[in-house]
Amino acid sequence: MSSSTHTNFKQYLAAVKPQGEAAPAGLQELLIAVTQTCSTLSHEVAQGALIGLLGSAGTGNVQGEVQQKLDIIANDLLIEGVQGCKSLAGLASEEMELPVPVQGTGDYLLLFDPLDGSSNIDVNVSIGTIFSILKKQDPQAPLQTADFLLSGRHQVAAGYVVYGPQTTMALTLGDGVVMFTLNKVTGEFLLIKDAVTIAHSTKEFAINMSNMRHWADPVKRYVEECLAGVGGAREKDFNMRWIASMVADVHRVLSRGGVFMYPWDQREPHKPGKLRLMYEANPMSFLVEQAGGASTNGTQLIMDLQPTDLHERVSVMLGSKEEIDRLQHYHSSLA
């Protein structure tokens, strides 16, 4: 099938009517700027060692993590790419301590993880960009960090772009999930799948099994039952997957079902989890819920959590609804 038979991203935004209304022009402008930047970033990622982009940058981010060269490049590209958006009041990045004013006033706030899974860059495993867009509560007021501290229910759009064998984007505007693939000749994202859904049941889970001894009892119980297979309490065999790149693992869940888990563990008991609520958990939870799945920290739905810090961390379990319901039940019954 030729690319001319596919709807491109701009055409999709012009035609789509989430909640029965056309996407606001300012939101369209911002989403187009983000995707155009991701198209550029896809090219940079693909060049890798050929243009000297692999390896550590020798610096650390606000999270205390070693930055890869591409982390910094991706962050800079995204900031530069959205600077001209008149409706964008400000942005926040996983790589930076404080928000950055863009227009100062405006309707929207952008949050992003510029390059999720960047520890996999040098081994050529899929990585990606995750983004979330919020409506600024008072568009005319000067930008403050507190403007970003809204629950996931306030998101008006969220998505990710995964840089793999194809560069593919998943997007929700709050009315289901659609997917696009980048035509690397034209630089356009083309619609490949609408009405993406996650099956309610599954036989596949993703978790880092090497940390099993550190997990809380409800997660241990769930995984042990999966491992017991057809002869155990679940009476069916499960497969385990783990890419160690959230964007790639969640893309698999959206594409064919399953459960992704990055739970709290006892190695850092004072931290509620590893993943970032605002840059990773909220946008991925929005996508998963819109595809018919669910997302929890064990006791609460991720999207209902009220953030108190821009870089807040959280335990994450998301995917097929029956499995997430089971995990929540185990957490409540073993509490």
Swiss-Prot record:
Top-level taxon of the source organism: Bacteria
Cellular compartments per GO CC: cytosol
Residues given in the record as Mg(2+) 2 binding sites: D113, D116, E280
Record bears the keyword Metal-binding: yes
Cofactor(s) needed by this chain: Mg(2+)
Gene3D superfamilies, per database record: 3.40.190.80, Fructose-1,6-Bisphosphatase, subunit A, domain 1
Keyword set, alphabetical order: Carbohydrate metabolism, Cytoplasm, Hydrolase, Magnesium, Metal-binding
Pathway: Carbohydrate biosynthesis; gluconeogenesis
Record-given protein name: Fructose-1,6-bisphosphatase class 1
Organism of derivation: Polynucleobacter asymbioticus (strain DSM 18221 / CIP 109841 / QLW-P1DMWA-1)
